[in-house]
């Protein structure tokens, strides 16, 4: 029995004035990743690719697993940051990977409002498709779907919380030239 879970999270935050524009900061992807991801769980594996290891997650008190996602993150010439999943693993659920598919897409872009103040606006979409393992065949599908959707929402809300809490603060530190106090990628482990 196949099932699909989905969550969408939207973000909008104001950007305070600083000596350097937010567009420059968005081009420094290592800074951006360092600000929104736990450096202890993040590894840079190529110039625009990062492997993120999430904290272990429980599902319906039956399964505990750790999602590991490889993301391509880049900034285009219009200063829009794009996120796309390239690969994934679910440590602890290896026997259930048949038919499993995870897709992450996202974007973040600077927008000037009527008063010429900068805002960052974006969204992230997380989708999972899988074949339900036999132990869940007898669980009402609506309960499984509701639980799966909630789990994905919680993942995106954690990332959004980190973005709202850390990104602007890190940008201000970076823009004022105190890079050593910012999250600018120096803490990311690199493995080409």
Swiss-Prot record:
Q: Which Gene3D superfamilies match?
A: 3.30.530.20
Q: Which domain of life is it from?
A: Bacteria
A Pfam family it matches? DUF1997
Q: Which PANTHER family match?
A: OS07G0633000 PROTEIN
What is this protein called in UniProt?
Uncharacterized protein SYNPCC7002_A1590
């Amino acid at each position: 029995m196949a099932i699909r879970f989905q969550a969408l999270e939207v973000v909008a935050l104001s950007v305070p004035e600083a000596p350097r524009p937010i567009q420059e900061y968005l081009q420094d992807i290592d800074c951006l990743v360092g600000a929104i991801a736990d450096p202890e769980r993040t590894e840079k594996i190529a110039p625009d690719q990062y492997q993120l290891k999430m904290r272990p997650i429980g599902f319906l008190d039956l399964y505990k697993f750790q999602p590991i996602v490889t993301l391509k993150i880049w900034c285009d010439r219009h200063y829009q940051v794009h996120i796309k999943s390239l690969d994934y693993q679910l440590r602890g659920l290896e026997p259930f990977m048949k038919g499993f598919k995870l897709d992450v897409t996202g974007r973040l872009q600077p927008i000037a409002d009527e008063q010429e103040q900068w805002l960052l606006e974006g969204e992230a979409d997380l989708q999972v498709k899988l074949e339900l393992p036999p132990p869940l065949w007898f669980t009402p599908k609506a309960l499984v779907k509701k639980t799966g959707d909630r789990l994905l929402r919680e993942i995106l809300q954690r990332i959004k919380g980190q973005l709202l809490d850390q990104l602007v603060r890190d940008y201000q530190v970076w823009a004022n030239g105190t890079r050593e106090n910012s999250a600018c990628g120096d803490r990311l482990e690199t493995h080409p």
